[in-house]
Amino acid sequence: MWKTLHQLAIPPRLYQICGWFIPWLAIASVVVLTVGWIWGFGFAPADYQQGNSYRIIYLHVPAAIWSMGIYASMAVAAFIGLVWQMKMANLAVAAMAPIGAVFTFIALVTGSAWGKPMWGTWWVWDARLTSELVLLFLYVGVIALWHAFDDRRLAGRAAGILVLIGVVNLPIIHYSVEWWNTLHQGSTRMQQSIDPAMRSPLRWSIFGFLLLSATLTLMRMRNLILLMEKRRPWVSELILKRGRK
């Protein structure tokens, strides 16, 4: 198994594999998100308490879920990079960090907009909101560490250590609404009372965000591989082939 993984992690091979998957994932993400958003924003019934303002859920919840999901994936990659010294694992951490940061920012902004009518303010130092803000700072810290060192191996090690330290924040985000008395509503997935006509497009949106994050990660992986391997012969050959086209 590890032999196969190491073979797949060879830069030219991984670059090629990413290229195979990107078009299909991109098409799938556009289709799934289009279905989820048209269904959710256009055809799902209005909420009996919040009216149409609840529809921001189709943007907020997927972004919030995958802001944590991406970080968990980064933690797995960071562990592999630190333990088995796989350069491509460190590269995966660097590839996912900006995407996770954007998803976290979207979750915070949409959450504030959604909470304004109910809380009477754009921001409260609620346990869920504060821990999600900490997650954004962790993403920014990982990005900063990756760019702070010229040595990619050292940069990957430093970023990986920060990622693993920050994992403790994930259960705090998830269980904050259960551990503390917070203003934030309970986890959406736990609320079985939600109307199926609202829940189905939400699931499409969540899956669409997953496909989108995978697409963007693979695109960034290809760019980072080229940047890291820019002095290798295979990159020069690739540039020449593209130039002939």
From Swiss-Prot:
Question: Where primarily located?
Answer: membrane
Name its species: Escherichia coli (strain K12)
- Where can this protein be found? Cell inner membrane
| GO terms, molecular function | heme binding; heme transmembrane transporter activity
The record describes its membrane topology as: Multi-pass membrane protein
Mapped to this chain, the residue ranges on the Periplasmic side of the membrane are: 42-63, 112-128, 181-205
* Protein role: Required for the export of heme to the periplasm for the biogenesis of c-type cytochromes.
| Keyword field | Cell inner membrane, Cell membrane, Cytochrome c-type biogenesis, Membrane, Transmembrane, Transmembrane helix, Transport
GO CC terms on record? ATP-binding cassette (ABC) transporter complex; plasma membrane
Q: Which family, according to UniProt?
A: Belongs to the CcmC/CycZ/HelC family.
Q: Where are the transmembrane segments?
A: 21-41, 64-84, 91-111, 129-149, 160-180, 206-226
Q: What Pfam family is a match for this entry? A: Cytochrom_C_asm
Q: What GO terms describe the biological role, i.e. biological process, of this protein?
A: cytochrome c biosynthetic process; cytochrome complex assembly; heme import across plasma membrane
Entry-linked PANTHER family: CYTOCHROME B_B6 PROTEIN-RELATED, HEME EXPORTER PROTEIN C
Cytoplasmic-side positions:
1-20, 85-90, 150-159, 227-245
> How is this protein named in the record?
Heme exporter protein C
